[in-house]
Amino acid sequence: MSISGTLSSYYVDSIISHESEDAPPAKFPSGQYASSRQPGHAEHLEFPSCSFQPKAPVFGASWAPLSPHASGSLPSVYHPYIQPQGVPPAESRYLRTWLEPAPRGEAAPGQGQAAVKAEPLLGAPGELLKQGTPEYSLETSAGREAVLSNQRPGYGDNKICEGSEDKERPDQTNPSANWLHARSSRKKRCPYTKYQTLELEKEFLFNMYLTRDRRHEVARLLNLSERQVKIWFQNRRMKMKKMNKEQGKE
């Protein structure tokens, strides 16, 4: 009987153990875990708990939740950051200056006009233009008239054969321009007017050689220089000699 009782108890225990494998928490009640872990907590009670001071958040607004339509395509670790629309706190203002520069002309509502600084604008090279400051010319009317009188053509500009050059001189600093635009240094030839030529021809027929006083008087009457009258008479005598030679050969 003892053997049969032992076997029956063995079979009963094996059946009960197999059935209880599916639910292991039922085998050990929750009271055992609580009683076993309580001594562990009691061992660390002699150390004081650490107290940390709460710090201000760096950014004003918290992380916004991800939209449902975009959460499916992004991994679970990714947290998008949406720029807050509100005014940041005073502690984080210095961190946002490089992110969002404030306009130059605007100032904080608490500041006065002393904080606003008008910055000059760069115009042409070497010039500074200020905003909102009109420019006034200090030039007087007398100075303007003097400048205009200097720019007006004078009597010397209307003179005939005043020694103006053929064309404007090229750039003296550029040797290639001097070589390409090389011209003679002779002055521009100023022809005499018909009236001047007629009067000189009359004087030449009357006398081929002029005295100094007569040359001075003719130059004054015809608005010419004495040198011009002298050269004209020399050329006219050479032309007359040439015509006489041609007539003698014929």
UniProtKB/Swiss-Prot annotation:
Annotated region Disordered: the residues are 21-47, 149-182
**Chief place where the protein resides:** nucleus
User: Example GO biological process term?
Assistant: proximal/distal pattern formation
Instruction: Using the record's annotations, give every residue carrying the modification Phosphothreonine.
Output: 133
Q: Which residues bind DNA?
A: 185-244
Record-linked Pfam families: Homeodomain, Hox9_act
> Where does it sit, as one GO cellular component term?
nucleoplasm
Q: Which family does it belong to?
A: Belongs to the Abd-B homeobox family.
Protein name in the entry: Homeobox protein Hox-B9
Source organism of the structure: Homo sapiens (Human)
> What gene is this protein translated from?
HOXB9
